[in-house]
Amino acid sequence: RNACIVVFPEGESHAGSELLKLKTGVARIALGAEQRCGPLGLRIVPVGLNFDAKQKFRSRVLISIGKPIDPLAGHEQADAESREAVNRVMGLVEEGIKSVTLNYPSWEEAKLIQRAAALYDARQQLDPEEASLAEEFSIQKQLADAYLRTKENNPRRVARIIEAVNGYDRLL
């Protein structure tokens, strides 16, 4: 009681552009504890570790903390053996982790979004040296989320945006 445990549901450290497939242990642990010892009021707290330069030793890191997840949300009983219950909790965990991390379908798209963020900073006359990692993250997160929504709903518009950013880069 009144303690925390840390679980990294990706199961490994990586430098990929997006979240890896999550392991189900966090859901099974939470549901199992509630089932055997509950009700405990357990919460799963998504935490994002967002590095300034993943490949650089001792680069800056922003630790983003998401909204606590109730593994029993809308359900009276926990069942750690139920695939449906585990998948439901894992869906919430994945959504929570994605809300506090940057996720790009590819490194090319990551570079595009980072370039768009730099153009935004320049247009707003923001000095990247003075911007906090939290400010940089917020801008990139908003751009990445908007990019992914637009890519899904209007791929032609995304193609035009990519061409415009690439055209601007060619002019430089």
Language-model features: locations:
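Non-catalytic C-terminal accessory region of glycerolipid acyltransferases
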Residues: 1-172
